[in-house]
């Protein structure tokens, strides 16, 4: 059986720390503790170890970080400019604390994914690229034509009934000349995508333009993933931003069982491959052990 009692954060789903420890310490059991991490950088390692070693109900372990020195920082505010480059994981103990952050990120034109959904409609991105393919003389399949026609106004951009695309098969490709000559397209091939796809919302057009100016690669999934800590277990990223805000209910749970919350934040800290940014809370309610540890080290 493979398991890590320090990351058993799904107690409500049957991840029983006591059961795992009991099985590991049963007479005749052979324990093999992995002594080398190939993810956790040296700068994060002492903070993670210091946190989890406060738990009494655990299997003692000694393990080494990877060769990467890495970086750990303790900013006093959520600096969204950090997201300009690199692969990121934004983590918080609850979705509630991520909602406002996601709203701020959208307002600043930051491209991210959360729960499998992108902050910008994939349809909008695909339509923009499809129009550019037409401009470059490439052919589009039926599903691509339907997509751009969805964002083009009838009468001004398309002849009446053009969206029916009568007689077109799924495997057929259509060029700009085909669409203009046989399928009711009225727009010039020189028309910029944002003018051609005039039914796309202004917000999405602005965001796509902003991302293109920043040289964001929209042909790939977002570099930034937003998740609760529980949702990110098993994941990793080069850079992790960890929000330490907790709810009032979370604070009550911490007073009842601090070891459970330490496991949660230990799991979050150990997602980072290069950098960990532990952000100060916006309210007075926080899981403060990591930042308190940092303050002690600075004295």
PLM regions: where:
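Conserved helicase motor core of SF1/SF2 NTP-dependent helicases
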Residues: 1-68, 85, 89-107, 113-122, ...
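Short, surface-exposed amphipathic charged segments that create phosphate/polyanion-binding patches used
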Residues: 46-51, 125-133, 293-294
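Short secondary-structure transition/capping segments
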Residues: 49-53, 80-85, 163-174
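Conserved interdomain hinge at the start of the Helicase C-terminal
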Residues: 71-87
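Charge-dense polyanion-binding interfaces
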Residues: 111-153
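Conserved helicase C-terminal RecA-like lobe
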Residues: 135-279
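Charge-dense, low-complexity polyampholytic segments
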Residues: 283-295
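Acidic, low-complexity intrinsically disordered tails
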Residues: 298-299
């Amino acid at each position: 059986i493979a398991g890590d009692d320090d990351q058993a954060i799904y107690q409500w789903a049957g991840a029983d720390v006591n059961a795992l420890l009991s099985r590991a310490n049963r007479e005749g059991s052979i324990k093999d503790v992995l002594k080398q991490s190939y993810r956790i950088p040296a700068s994060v390692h002492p903070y993670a170890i210091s946190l989890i070693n406060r738990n009494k109900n655990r299997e003692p372990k000694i393990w080494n970080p990877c060769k990467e020195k890495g970086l750990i920082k303790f900013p006093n505010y959520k600096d969204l400019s950090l997201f300009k480059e690199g692969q990121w994981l934004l983590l918080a103990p609850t979705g509630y604390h991520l909602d406002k952050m996601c709203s701020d990120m959208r307002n600043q034109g930051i491209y991210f994914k959360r729960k499998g959904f992108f902050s910008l409609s994939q349809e909008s991105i695909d339509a923009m690229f499809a129009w550019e393919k037409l401009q470059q003389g490439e052919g589009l399949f039926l599903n691509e034509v339907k997509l751009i026609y969805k964002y083009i106004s009838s009468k001004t951009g398309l002849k009446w009934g053009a969206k029916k695309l009568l007689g077109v098969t799924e495997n057929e490709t259509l060029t700009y000349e085909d669409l203009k000559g046989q399928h009711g397209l009225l727009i010039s091939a020189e028309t910029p995508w944002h003018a051609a796809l005039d039914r796309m919302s202004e917000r999405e057009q602005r965001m796509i333009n902003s991302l293109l100016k920043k040289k964001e690669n929209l042909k790939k999934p977002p570099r930034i993933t937003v998740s609760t800590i529980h949702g990110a277990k098993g994941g990793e990223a080069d850079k992790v931003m960890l929000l330490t805000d907790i709810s009032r209910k979370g604070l009550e749970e911490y007073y009842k069982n601090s070891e459970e919350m330490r496991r949660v934040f230990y799991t979050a800290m150990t997602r980072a491959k290069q950098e960990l940014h532990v952000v100060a809370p916006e309210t007075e309610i926080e899981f403060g052990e990591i930042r308190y540890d940092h303050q002690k080290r600075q004295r």
